[in-house]
Amino acid sequence: YLCGRKATEWLIVMQNTFSDRSGSQKLPEEMLAGGSQNQVAKAGSTVHRRIQGHPALHKYLLYLEKEGMEGVPRFLGIDEEGREILTYLPGETMGRDFPPTHPCLHSDATLAALGRFMRRLHDASAGFLPEALRFSWKSPFPDEPCDTICHGDAAIWNFVFQGGLPVGLFDFDQAHPGTRLWDLTTTLFSAIPLTYFTYDRETQEMREYSPEKDAAERRRRIHLFFTSYGIPCPRNSIELTALRIEKDFCGQMREGAAAGDETCIRMIREGQLRHYEKVLAHLREHGGEWI
């Protein structure tokens, strides 16, 4: 889930060239840094990357295009090196550094826009569910009935921002049939954020969470997110978020390290597992204050 996550900053400009889909033009590639499991190259208005995972993903992206879903990559085909070609989403990426310090990430406008974007995505995806259930996906289906296609990692660091607001979402490698609420837990966790620190609006800095000072504001923002999505705040939203962090953030990092995955081993060495374990303990201690 987290292992091998792509970073967003540019590394170098490579002078490799390739033909575009029409075969009529050569474009230079700019390699994106940070993808230890997959190199990603930008060329003009397209992104070229090694194909990851299941064949259903391309069908899903084509379906979203047919449904007119804006702000997601379009699948354009396969290049001569066997890499998938996707449209590039212009804008700025934020939130990969935790804690997120950019003021726009803590604004009500951003939070509401995230909720509305996820609702549009889930509504557009729901019609693909009957076909999707015929395929094998990278992530297992949930035990409960599926109601949409989950992005699988809809955290703020996978959104594209313009003018301080989220306008696009990329990295659909973890997409799978699932439930809307399960998919929303990652957005909720990363956007509030549901962590042991909080954003001080007066100082515009992060500080330690205080139940007396911060519980009401955190509750307000959680309810704002779900209201913007178009549903009442589910009573089990914090419980599901804790389960998601335990299973996908902590569990898969441990499993990957045990299997020798160098990226997971590095992330644990850097303290990321310890961080998410603290987040999990924080949710279990204080989550009841926010619903």
Where are these regions (language model features)?
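Active-site activation/catalytic loop segments of kinase-like enzymes and analogous catalytic loops
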Residues: 184-231, 246-260
